[in-house]
Swiss-Prot record:
Gene Ontology CC terms: peroxisomal membrane; peroxisome
Domain of life: Eukaryota
Protein name as catalogued: Uncharacterized protein YGR168C
Disulfide bridge partners, by residue number: none
GO annotation, biological process: regulation of peroxisome organization
Protein's UniProt keywords contain Transmembrane: yes
Membrane topology: Multi-pass membrane protein
Length: 376
């Protein structure tokens, strides 16, 4: 006859239940609620992340491959990272002996990066790197020193144009021929297509900035016009604060000035402007000449970097021709370089170098540097 072994598993389960009961008795109602919230967060994070991996696993099954442990580990690793970022930071904040936010955030980032394997795309790191450096440059001592020197606006814009010419040469040498920045700068396009594309971009950006001003800036329509400037009457545009201050020799001239003021106030108001005035004041019309200038410059860049002329021109000659084109289309140095496009091409260039030297530890170092830079 077989002798039954003592039920050790049953005793272990009962002992585990007793431990849980004692822990629950030690915790008050407030701590229980916090524990329930933490468990819900953990469940949500793992569940939401599981939805994205289920599609990958289904595709693998359709291809006739079996799901292995190596396929499940990325889901567990990434979910654990999200849980740490979601829970560990508020938990550390409650410890009285750790009152430094820098220590809290650095410890979380360090733990999270140790669990990762550098699977973050390089273009995301390039984006955060350029944005972090740009935000720090705004408050840097060198920037403050340049502002105190009171350089003229034309000098600063000319310096920007020189940097753009040098950056275009570097981008041509380093960018992938199939990438979007390369096609934007160097691909062949007719003049009209270039013009309407650039004008459309200017119009969209202008509408975007106007929408932001409408929702995030205070002010009434009585003291601001469409462009956000103070409404001034016709006399103020002519350099006189009030039309009553004009040296009027005839009383009829005063009535003329009053009439001109009325016409001017009606013209700047969109509600009373006719179709012709709205077209004249539209963003498309206002951006006509700036778009024309940038189109000429873009066509010049395409001409300089065409395959047939690549060997005939050196980089110095290309840079000189681009600077001369800037001087031709903008003799008064008023063509400002948009920070949006400057950052876009900077991110593209950084992404090229990240792809070239990309590996797990290098990505971790950059991520850790970005997190440190963001809280300094």
């Amino acid at each position: 006859m077989k002798h039954n072994r003592p039920n050790g598993t049953g005793k272990a389960v009962s002992g585990f239940k007793q431990i849980i009961r004692r822990l629950l008795l030690l915790l008050n109602k407030k701590r229980r609620k916090q524990l329930v919230i933490i468990l819900k967060r953990i469940t949500q994070v793992y569940g939401i992340n599981l939805v994205f991996y289920v599609k990958k696993w289904k595709l693998k099954k359709l291809q006739g491959e079996n799901i292995q442990i190596n396929d499940i580990m990325p889901w567990l690793r990434e979910s654990t990272i999200l849980v740490l970022l979601n829970i560990l930071y508020p938990t550390l904040m409650k410890f009285p002996f750790l009152k430094n936010h820098y220590i809290h955030w650095s410890s979380i980032v360090g733990i999270s990066l140790m669990l990762t394997k550098g699977e973050v795309p390089s273009w995301i790191i390039a984006h955060f790197l350029v944005e972090a450096i740009a935000s720090k440059l705004k408050i840097a001592k060198l920037t403050q020193w340049l502002k105190k020197k009171n350089f003229s606006q034309g000098t600063l814009i000319k310096f920007q144009q020189i940097l753009v010419c040098l950056a275009i040469i570097v981008l041509f040498a380093k960018l992938d021929r199939s990438s979007l920045p390369f096609r934007v700068l160097f691909d062949h396009r007719p003049f009209l297509i270039d013009f309407f594309t650039i004008n459309a971009i200017f119009t969209v950006l202008a509408v975007y900035h106007r929408t932001l001003k409408f929702f995030f800036t205070s002010g009434t329509k009585s003291n601001k016009n469409v462009g956000g400037h103070e409404v001034r009457n016709f006399s103020q545009y002519l350099g006189v604060k009030n039309h009553n201050d004009w040296p009027i020799s005839s009383s009829n001239l005063k009535h003329v000035m009053d009439r001109l003021n009325e016409i001017h106030e009606v013209t700047i108001d969109d509600n009373y402007a006719n179709i012709n005035e709205k077209i004249i004041n539209s963003y498309f019309t206002k951006g006509f000449f700036p778009s024309l200038k940038w189109t000429i410059l873009r066509q010049c860049i395409e001409y300089l970097f065409v395959t047939k002329r690549r060997r005939l021109m050196g980089n110095k000659l290309r840079c000189i021709v681009m600077l001369l084109t800037f001087t031709f289309v903008d003799p008064t140095s008023k063509m400002k370089i948009s920070p949006f496009f400057a950052k876009f091409f900077a991110k593209s260039l950084v992404n090229v170098y990240l792809k070239k030297y990309w590996h797990c530890n290098f990505g971790k170092y950059i991520l850790f540097f970005l997190f440190q830079l963001s809280i300094m």
